[in-house]
Amino acid sequence: MKTFSAKPQSVTRDWYVVDATDKTLGRLATEIARRLRGKHKPEYTPHVDTGDYIVVVNAEKVRVTGNKAQAKNYYRHTGYPGGLRSMSFEKLIDHAPERVIESAVKGMLPKGPLGRAMYSKLKVYAGAEHPHAAQQPLELNL
């Protein structure tokens, strides 16, 4: 019996919607990253993007444990000398709640062109509304 290897043109992708309300950030991000990679499918192939599309709603209601709300910092650089900026989880969840989930998931995906293709299938929205109703996403309970 030969080992199955998925071809990029033969991959079928589903759309899923995930509600992040009162979910722990890391536990939610690991399951999202797993599904973006396609590791939940029997036809998973490491060098082919076999993952599904994931729409995350209510990103502003995601939780962290312990004192991470104050202690966890997110860093970015403006591109100018001395341009390192940091923001705590508390401030970032008020300012741009999508970035919290996006950065957690992005760190769990492969680095390189394949990882960027997987990351592009992640859609995160702060509120309960999303513009992907035409894709008829399935509810995913994590």
UniProtKB/Swiss-Prot annotation:
Source superkingdom: Bacteria
Gene this protein is translated from: rplM
Biological process (GO), any one: translation
Keyword set, alphabetical order: Ribonucleoprotein, Ribosomal protein
Family: Belongs to the universal ribosomal protein uL13 family.
GO cellular component: cytosolic large ribosomal subunit
Biological function: This protein is one of the early assembly proteins of the 50S ribosomal subunit, although it is not seen to bind rRNA by itself. It is important during the early stages of 50S assembly.
Protein name per UniProt: Large ribosomal subunit protein uL13
Entries under Pfam families matching the protein: Ribosomal_L13
Source species: Chromohalobacter salexigens (strain ATCC BAA-138 / DSM 3043 / CIP 106854 / NCIMB 13768 / 1H11)
Molecular function GO labels: mRNA binding; structural constituent of ribosome
Quaternary structure annotation from Swiss-Prot or TrEMBL: Part of the 50S ribosomal subunit.
Signal peptide: none
